[in-house]
A protein has these predicted regions:
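Short Gly/Pro-enriched turn/cap motifs at secondary-structure boundaries
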Residues: 22, 90, 153-154, 288-291
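Acidic/histidine-rich catalytic neighborhood
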Residues: 58-111
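Catalytic cores of secreted or luminal carbohydrate-active enzymes
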Residues: 247-299, 303
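Active-site core of glycosidic bond-cleaving carbohydrate-active enzymes
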Residues: 1-42, 51, 95-271, 308
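Primarily short, surface-exposed interaction patches in extracytoplasmic proteins
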Residues: 1-4, 12-16, 39-59, 66, ...
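C-terminal beta-sandwich/jelly-roll accessory domains of carbohydrate-active enzymes
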Residues: 304-338
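Short acidic-glycine loop/turn motifs at beta-strand connectors
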Residues: 71-72, 302-305
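A glycine-rich phosphate-binding loop feature that marks nucleotide/adenosyl-phosphate handling sites
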Residues: 80-81, 125-130, 242, 275-282
Length: 338
């Protein structure tokens, strides 16, 4: 299905993005991030990524440019949404918009840095990124937007995109970890979670997996599968519907599948993480031929709470860095350089 998505993005993204209301540009940037990640997992080289991603990113940035405002040495976003809070109201400096623009700028810059190429707007991208408004926060963590705290329970974690899936704020930085922990707990507990739906539980599982908290990630996935999930119904075949069965929602079971694999393997910040968030009771577990950024397929086995072996194959011959807990040495058993 990745190829179908890639083809669809190539065919319709430019025309769609040029016709939308600027307040919705974050949605299309998120779609572009999925497209970019597909290329990264497929092992595309940076020249190919630049060729395929940059034209679409430039179209998206042109829309952001319409709602950028410079004030007191800071770039701000005006009138942008934070799905699906308060019925798609528009806000200034929504965390959803700021994270989307930040990812877009960082990707444009990286594509040119990695290919040693230039662009007339390169300096401007860097200047906007450097002076972009900080993510609005309060005592409960990340807010919806500037002057708009998260005060109502709702299903979407759109205000947390800087953590996941964009991974702009890394949890190995202590202040980032504290911010994410506080933000997740507030989002899930607000009004006893009355606005949560299936997507909330799968998203929370991914956020906890990003923190390396396998127990809480598993707890959220188990709730999704076994307990009431608000307006949602999970069917035995993993098909998922909302609104008393009227609305099929394919992204939720796909999100659940992603959450499950993220307990076993994650690849971000140029590092492949093996068993980064397994719950304590998964003493014995294994996975086979899961993909990682850079065109790698990875298999591994864990027994009695310890990783026994890891098998990694590079489809493109690119180097990689692996993070394993509990190993003080690595022994290569294969004769080939893979």
């Amino acid at each position: 299905q990745g190829k179908n998505f890639q083809r669809l993005m190539d065919e319709v993204f430019p025309s769609l993005v040029r016709s939308i209301e600027p307040c919705k540009i974050g949605d299309y940037t998120w779609a572009l991030q999925n497209y970019y990640m597909y290329l990264r997992y497929a092992g595309a080289d940076w020249q190919d990524i630049k060729q395929q991603v940059v034209p679409k990113a430039l179209d998206a940035f042109a829309v952001f440019d319409k709602i950028l405002c410079y004030k007191e040495n800071t770039w701000h976003l005006t009138h942008i949404e934070s799905p699906e809070y308060e019925g798609f109201q528009k806000y200034n400096d929504s965390n959803y918009g700021l994270a989307s623009l930040s990812w877009l700028l960082q990707t444009l810059i990286a594509c040119h840095d990695r290919t040693s190429s230039t662009h007339p707007d390169y300096a401007r991208w860097k200047e906007i990124l450097t002076r972009l408004a900080p993510y609005p926060t309060n005592e409960n963590g990340l807010m919806i937007a500037a002057n708009k705290p998260l005060e109502k329970s709702h299903r979407h974690y759109s205000h947390l995109l800087a953590f996941y899936p964009f991974r702009l704020l890394h949890p190995d930085v202590p202040e980032n970890r504290k911010l994410l922990e506080k933000s997740i707990e507030h989002w899930l507990s607000l009004e006893d979670g009355k606005g949560l739906a299936g997507y909330s539980y799968t998203g929370a599982a991914s956020l906890y997996a990003y923190l390396g908290n396998g127990n809480k990630a598993y707890e959220r996935l188990a709730h999704f599968i076994n307990k009431p999930i608000g307006i949602s119904i999970l069917l035995p075949n993993t098909f998922y519907v909302e609104s008393q069965g009227k609305n099929p929602v394919i992204e939720t079971p796909l999100s659940a599948a992603a959450s499950l694999t993220e307990l076993l393997i994650q690849s971000w910040d140029e590092t492949i993480r093996i068993f980064p968030a397994v719950p304590d009771h998964w003493k014995d577990c294994a996975f086979h031929a899961l993909r990682a950024e850079g065109g790698f397929t990875v298999s591994a086995q864990r027994q009695d709470g310890r990783t026994e072996w890891v098998s990694l194959t590079s489809e493109k011959g690119q180097p990689c860095r692996i993070q394993l807990s509990g190993w003080d040495a690595v022994h290569q058993l294969s004769a080939e350089r893979t």
